[in-house]
From Swiss-Prot:
Note: Overexpression seems to confer resistance to penicillin.
Expression induction: By phosphate starvation.
Lipid-anchored residues (N-palmitoyl cysteine): 22
InterPro entries listed in its UniProt record: PBP_domain, Phosphate_ABC_transporter
Cited function: Part of the ABC transporter complex PstSACB involved in phosphate import.
Protein name from the UniProt record: Phosphate-binding protein PstS 2
Recorded family membership: Belongs to the PstS family.
Biological process (GO), any one: phosphate ion transport
Location of the protein in the cell: Cell membrane
Keyword field contains Membrane: yes
Gene3D superfamilies: Periplasmic binding protein-like II (3.40.190.10)
Bilayer topology term: Lipid-anchor
Taxonomic path: Bacteria, Bacillati, Bacillota, Bacilli, Lactobacillales
């Protein structure tokens, strides 16, 4: 009888401990859901940042100038991988990346109730979308022109869709190799570079004597490199400004959405465009304010 009583008391003790533990866990979850928002942004010159701030209205025009009102407290990352890592490691973080680079390590929020997907980008329902452009000068080599022809071909656009991006060209023709040789330098957007690596790999299977060097350092850097003739082709993950496009030819190689991402433990599932602008400009600073 005494032994049975001791077991009962032990069970009550464990049960109490469990309730305390659950209570603490619940409190932690609540704290995570209502904590201070950690804004993760891309660097100045990033095409993803340029497109994101323009679409959300964070980028304001003041006469001939454009003012980026991204929160001064934002943690700046210089690559897509940097944003993914920062969001994955912080329960209260929020960032933005290329939809084609989205992995299961983070969670994408719906925007105004619309999920980011190939279909919602194609039909225009998903508001955060942009083209992946390439730029080149009028004196581009025969090899460079052939590589661009491959990108726009049936085989090239198949590489685009195989890598979770959206094809820019619906009417395409078969690419026929001319068995060229030589070297190309492609510079620019970190969002475009992962796709460009796959395109270069597929092109080199058709042209084994070709070397393609790819440098990921931001859209603006890609445009500058082509203008300064230190690169053959530039990668740009946004629309070009009239000034940028003056002396260059550009064309879209793919379409892409911009996914707004949070930690997988975050309870939020959607955000409005208005809330998004307020979050990334520093006006809305806690998760409990997002409805």
């Amino acid at each position: 009888m005494k032994f049975k009583k001791m077991l009962t008391l032990a069970a009550i003790g464990l049960s109490g401990f469990g309730l305390v533990a659950c209570g603490n866990q619940s409190a932690a979850s609540k704290q995570s859901a209502s904590g201070t928002i950690e804004v993760i942004s891309r660097e100045n010159g990033s095409g993803t940042r340029g497109a994101f701030t323009e679409i959300t209205g964070i980028l304001k025009k003041d006469g001939d100038k454009k003012i980026d009102n991204t929160a001064k407290t934002a943690v700046i990352q210089n690559s897509t991988e940097g944003v993914l890592s920062a969001v994955q490691g912080n329960a209260n973080a929020i960032g933005y990346i290329s939809l084609g680079s989205l992995t299961k390590s983070v969670k994408a929020l719906e925007i105004d109730g619309v999920k980011a997907s190939r279909d919602t980008v194609l039909d225009g329902e998903y508001p955060l979308q942009r083209p992946f452009n390439i730029v080149w000068s009028s004196n581009l080599s025969k090899l460079g022109q052939d590589f661009i022809s491959f990108i726009h071909s049936k085989q090239g656009q198949q590489v685009v869709t195989d890598n979770k991006f959206i094809e820019a060209k619906t009417e395409t023709t078969e690419y026929t190799s001319q068995h060229l040789s030589g070297k190309l330098s492609v510079v620019g957007s970190t969002s475009v570079s992962s796709l460009m690596e796959k395109l270069a790999e597929a092109y080199k299977k058709e042209n084994p004597e070709v070397t393609i060097d790819i440098t990921s350092n931001g859209s603006s850097a890609g445009i500058t490199a082509v203008k300064e003739k230190t690169a053959d082709i530039g990668m740009v993950s946004r629309e070009l400004t009239p000034e940028e496009g003056k002396s260059l030819t550009h064309d879209a190689i793919a379409l892409d959405g911009i996914a707004v991402v949070v930690n997988n433990d975050n309870k939020a599932s959607q955000v409005s465009m208005a809330e998004l602008a307020d979050v990334f400009s520093g006006k809305l600073t806690t998760w409990d304010k997002i409805k």
